[in-house]
């Protein structure tokens, strides 16, 4: 090998883009080594594995080579299997078979079967399995393990276990693969059975069981496995912290994070972003601030994903200035996620004009928006009532950025028209959509009809929803709300009766409030224990004071039964956000900000109570409902009564 060719190979190893690679390819041609399988194999390997969007070039290299060998084919099959187009792996594999002079080996089958797992085609998987049998490679450990993964990915646990049972001496990788397959096919008992049979287990075995239980929502089993683990690594702790948070047990997630620190281990990027995500979901502002301090002190502030999580946490906890401070501090490290998170945060708080300005600043910096950016932007326009701007940006998506609108973007436009009262325009917009509208899109319009009291259109929309999702309790409640607001109690009773007959249960409303770095959860209705009694007693005091000092009159249209006015007042007084507010006022020091997170949309009566309480008690109240943030201060709300 000459010095020049050796230099070309060293350049290839450091090559970062397709343009540079084509220049190196030109040098190979110049030195006459382009027909050598070793050098062409190196080029294909670099195209397929190391450079993004270079797979078509790798394929052309393969097609132009006189007699490509198995290594070249395997490399391309592997490249496609790890790409966004895994189905192309099968085409390359078939091409290899047709050549006649190249025979697939264990690597060929392992790569192509992995590709089949990624695009989840059980029929193609069966065909590849048959080919492996034909070539006598089904008993190969590498191929067998990949077959287990493929069948598990396609939801066919029975075949995954059959392949495993037929293996002569399965290694730990195969054991772990079949446990994973069981969990992916929702066979939790089968996974436990196989785990109990293992004579030798490694860290991965325990972590697979832990992750499987978490994904299945079996938290008690996950905790038991976690406590039995002989050694807990970063993956174990991260799985536990993130998984428990995703299952809604936020306080427990925080406890495990503290336990991780007490164990003398340092949180990694995954556990940090996971616990910050838990703070975001639960609205745990105080614990989030502590985590931010830890991030700064421990030197994690350079990690982009952690900063993005901080932006999201502060935004969802109601502190936009702090989110903006983190965002501004990132400077050159900002990625599309950073910009989008900040735009989404502003949108959540009704700062539509500022969100639009930031979007324009992002594009001026040369950052190209993606589909998610436009969802946040359209969301901002919707909550700020910027109808014309929203229409312009929706048009700009495809015309300027060549982004095909997806169902979420159409949903944002329906919300934009619906919130502004342009209900017929929203209806016509849905009818003219080039893609079939989903139940969520129609439900968005139904919510707007309910808010604006348009019963006639609400009934039409409900008919559409009956075709897509007839037994959704939320739709029936929205229609019931519209009838109740109009005083049509017979129609309300009819809906309630049909829900009882069909055994359709209404989604339980709950609210979270942070007191002393602990999250407390309240549900609507009367409870006779612990903190619920305390909250109810304080709420009675608040309601009396609001009536005396602010002339509060309950908006009984929020009560959904045809009962006496006094009973309606009693119903609306027990909403979960009111109980959370009362508990916070009872426990927090005077003047402390109150932060409440609710899973459903705040009703008009609760909204009125929050406004009056902020004035009478001199407190700032932040409520995050299903749709947006409401910042109550001095008797007014940041949403300007538009939500």
From Swiss-Prot:
InterPro entries found in the cross-reference section: DYW_dom, E_motif, Pentatricopeptide_rpt, PPR_At4g14850-like_plant, TPR-like_helical_dom_sf
GO molecular function: RNA binding; zinc ion binding
Gene that specifies this protein: PCMP-H71
Name of the molecule in the record: Pentatricopeptide repeat-containing protein At1g74630
NCBIfam families per record: PPR
Originating species: Arabidopsis thaliana (Mouse-ear cress)
GO biological process, one term: RNA modification
Region: Type E motif, residue numbers: 441-516
Family affiliation: Belongs to the PPR family. PCMP-H subfamily.
Type DYW motif, as annotated region: 549-643
Annotated PANTHER family: PENTATRICOPEPTIDE REPEAT-CONTAINING PROTEIN (PTHR47926:SF411)
Residues covered by region (Type E(+) motif): 517-547
This protein's UniProt keywords: Repeat
Pfam families in UniProt: DYW_deaminase, E_motif, PPR, PPR_2
Organism taxonomic ancestry: Eukaryota, Viridiplantae, Streptophyta, Embryophyta, Tracheophyta
Each PPR repeat, start to end: 69-103, 105-139, 140-170, 171-201, 202-236, 237-267, 268-302, 303-333, 335-369, 370-400, 406-436
């Amino acid at each position: 090998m000459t010095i020049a060719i050796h230099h070309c190979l060293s350049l290839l190893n450091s090559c970062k883009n397709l343009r540079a690679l084509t220049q190196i390819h030109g040098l190979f041609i110049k030195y006459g080594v382009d027909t050598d399988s070793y050098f062409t194999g190196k080029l294909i390997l670099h195209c397929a594995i190391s450079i993004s969007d270079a797979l078509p070039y790798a394929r052309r290299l393969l097609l132009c080579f006189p007699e490509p060998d198995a290594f070249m084919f395997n490399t391309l099959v592997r490249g496609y299997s790890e790409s966004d187009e895994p189905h192309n792996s099968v085409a390359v594999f078939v091409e290899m078979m047709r050549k006649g002079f190249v025979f697939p080996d264990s690597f060929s089958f392992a790569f192509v079967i992995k590709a089949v797992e990624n695009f989840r085609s059980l029929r193609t998987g069966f065909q590849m399995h048959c080919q492996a049998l034909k070539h006598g490679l089904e008993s190969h450990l590498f191929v067998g393990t990949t077959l287990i993964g493929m069948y598990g990915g396609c939801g066919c646990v029975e075949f995954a276990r059959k392949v495993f049972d037929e293996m002569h001496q399965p290694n730990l990788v195969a054991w772990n693969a079949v446990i994973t397959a069981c969990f992916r096919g929702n066979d939790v008992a089968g996974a436990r059975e196989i785990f109990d049979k293992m004579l030798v287990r490694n860290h991965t075995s325990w972590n697979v069981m832990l992750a499987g239980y978490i994904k299945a929502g079996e938290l008690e089993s996950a905790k038991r496995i976690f406590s039995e683990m002989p050694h807990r690594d970063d993956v174990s702790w991260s799985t536990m912290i993130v998984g428990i948070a995703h299952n809604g047990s936020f306080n427990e997630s925080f406890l495990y994070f503290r336990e991780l620190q007490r164990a003398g281990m340092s949180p990694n990027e995954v556990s940090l972003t996971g616990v910050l995500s838990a703070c975001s979901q639960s609205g745990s502002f105080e614990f989030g601030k502590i985590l931010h301090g830890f991030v700064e002190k421990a030197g994690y502030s350079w990690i982009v994903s952690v900063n993005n999580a901080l932006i999201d946490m502060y935004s969802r906890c109601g502190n936009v200035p702090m989110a903006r401070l983190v965002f501004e501090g990132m400077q050159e490290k900002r990625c599309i996620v950073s910009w989008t998170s900040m735009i989404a945060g502003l949108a959540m708080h009704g700062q539509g004009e500022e969100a639009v300005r930031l979007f324009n600043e992002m594009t001026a910096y040369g950052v190209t928006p993606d589909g998610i950016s436009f969802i946040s932007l359209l969301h901002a326009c919707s909550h700020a009532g910027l109808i014309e701007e929203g229409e312009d940006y929706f048009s700009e998506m495809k015309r300027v950025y060549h982004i095909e609108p997806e169902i979420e973007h159409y949903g944002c436009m329906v919300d934009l028209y619906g919130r502004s009262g342009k209900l017929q325009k929203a209806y016509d917009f849905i009818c003219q959509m080039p893609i079939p509208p989903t139940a969520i899109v129609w439900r968005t319009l139904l919510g707007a009809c309910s808010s604006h009291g348009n019963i006639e259109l609400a009934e039409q929309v409900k008919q559409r929803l009956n075709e897509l999702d007839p037994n959704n309790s939320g739709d029936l409640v929205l229609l019931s709300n519209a009838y109740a607001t109009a005083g049509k109690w017979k129609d309300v009773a009819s809906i309630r009766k049909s829900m009882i007959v069909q055994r359709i249960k209404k989604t339980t409303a709950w609210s979270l409030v942070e007191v002393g770095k602990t999250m407390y959860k309240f549900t609507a209705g009367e409870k006779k224990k612990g903190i619920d009694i305390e909250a109810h007693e304080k709420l009675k005091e608040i309601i009396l004071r609001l009536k005396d000092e602010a002339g509060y009159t309950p908006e009984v249209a929020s009560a959904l039964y045809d009962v006496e006015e006094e009973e309606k007042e009693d119903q609306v007084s027990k909403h979960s956000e009111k109980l959370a507010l009362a508990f916070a006022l009872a426990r927090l020091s005077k003047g402390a900000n109150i932060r409440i997170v609710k899973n459903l949309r705040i009703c008009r009566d609760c909204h009125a109570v929050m406004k009056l309480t902020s004035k009478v008690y001199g407190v700032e109240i932040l409520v995050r409902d299903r749709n947006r943030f409401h910042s109550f201060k001095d008797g007014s709300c940041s949403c300007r009564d538009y939500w």
